[in-house]
Amino acid sequence: MTTILFELGTEELPPKNLKTLRDALKNSVGTLLNDQNISFDDIHAFAAPRRLALTITGVGEFQPDRIETKKGPSVKAAFDDAGNLTRAGQGFLQGLNATGRNLSVKDLGRIADKKGEYIAYDLTIKGEKITDLMPNILQKALDDLPIAKRMRSGIDRHEFIRPVHWIVLMSDDVVIEATIQGHKTGNQSRGHRYHSPDFFAIDHADHYENLLKNHHVIADFDQRQADILAQVKTLADDVNGTAIMPQELLDEVTALVDLPVALRAS
């Protein structure tokens, strides 16, 4: 089983929308994976001022094969009185064999509904490689994000809530080559805008969160918020005070900083 890493690097995202975008991206990708019958263990969503990211753990190599029943003409139309295939029945069989199969009338089955009985064939559809499916899944999820007003940047015709600057897409330690939001995928991310502004390589999808910490970014929204709460409480306790932190304001502050450091004014 592998870990898929996706990171969308942008200009600063609107702080009042960041948590909503994080949750919507996670939910959309989860739904799309289920729709494609792709199993996984967990999706961990990250959101910081200049990035949205996901790690998807426990992902296999291929979709499972599936059975698709092909319905043909009615039994009455498919066979003549002698039990031989009519032109309608032959046409159905030829259509099944058009992709290289060598089926005969003995391979055909029958299905019935309230309108009658029909010839049919249970077609096995081989599962696709999951890394081939991920780029389209992720692009669809981005297209479906609840963004009231999208924008273009320069000559790029792809729209998003803010200009996109880089895309990371990996399966374990291998880049999944694709184009998302008009940008080629890679393994290059960026840290804190001032403390670690240069690109750095992600060597493995499982190392994402720790690598960002090494480059002065707490990528996990909830962890940043917990750090802010703990720091502010400590500062308040030092002067026997009580910190007043409305949740809406706390969410906004969490969305504004990569590496929170609380200060107490005199």
Swiss-Prot record:
InterPro entries xrefs: Gly-tRNA-synth_bsu (IPR015944), Gly-tRNA-synth_heterodimer (IPR006194)
Broad class of where this protein is predominantly found: cytoplasm
Domain of life: Bacteria
Keywords: Aminoacyl-tRNA synthetase, ATP-binding, Cytoplasm, Ligase, Nucleotide-binding, Protein biosynthesis
Reactions catalysed: tRNA(Gly) + glycine + ATP = glycyl-tRNA(Gly) + AMP + diphosphate
A GO CC term assigned to this protein in UniProt: cytosol
One Pfam family recorded for the sequence: tRNA_synt_2f
Cell compartments where the protein resides: Cytoplasm
Class of this enzyme: ligase
Assembly behavior: Tetramer of two alpha and two beta subunits.
Family, similarity comment: Belongs to the class-II aminoacyl-tRNA synthetase family.
Name of the protein described by the UniProt record: Glycine--tRNA ligase beta subunit
